[in-house]
C-alpha cells in the first residue's frame, strides 16, 4: 500500500512510503486495525497521524512529516 487515492496533491512514491511507514509502525505498536486506517485517513492529516508520530518517539520530526502530508494532500 503506497498510494492513497484520497490524496490529490503532489505524487511522490517516496513521500507516500515514509508517511505510510508511520502508520504501519503505529499499527504494529497497538495491533488495532482502526489505528492504521485512522492514521491514513484524510491523506495523513489527522490528529491520529500526529499522535502516532509522538507514540513512535518521532517528536523531532513532527513538523517535517506534517509538511510531507500537506504536499501529498
Swiss-Prot record:
Family indicated by similarity: Belongs to the arthropod CHH/MIH/GIH/VIH hormone family.
Organism for this UniProt entry: Armadillidium vulgare
Organism ancestry: Eukaryota, Metazoa, Ecdysozoa, Arthropoda, Crustacea
Subcellular location: Secreted
Keyword RNA-binding: no
Domain of life (superkingdom): Eukaryota
InterPro entries: Crust_neurhormone_CS, Crust_neurohorm, Crust_neurohorm_sf, Hyperglycemic, Hyperglycemic1
Summary of the tissues where the protein is detected: Produced by the medulla terminalis X-organ in the eyestalks and transported to the sinus gland where they are stored and released. Found also in the brain; in the neuroendocrine structures of the protocerebrum.
Alphabetical keyword list: Amidation, Carbohydrate metabolism, Disulfide bond, Glucose metabolism, Hormone, Neuropeptide, Secreted
Paired cysteines (S-S): 7-43, 23-39, 26-52
Sample GO molecular function, one term: neuropeptide hormone activity
Chief localisation class: secreted
Pfam families: Crust_neurohorm
N-terminal signal peptide: none
Protein name, UniProt field: Crustacean hyperglycemic hormone
Amino acid at each position: 500500500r503506497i498510494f492513497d487515492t484520497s490524496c490529490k496533491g503532489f505524487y511522490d512514491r517516496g513521500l507516500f512510503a515514509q508517511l505510510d511507514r508511520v502508520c504501519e509502525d503505529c499499527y504494529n505498536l497497538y495491533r488495532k486495525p482502526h489505528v492504521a486506517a485512522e492514521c491514513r485517513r484524510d491523506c495523513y492529516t489527522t490528529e491520529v497521524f500526529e499522535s502516532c508520530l509522538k507514540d513512535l518517539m518521532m517528536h523531532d520530526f513532527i513538523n517535517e512529516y506534517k509538511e510531507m502530508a500537506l504536499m501529498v494532500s
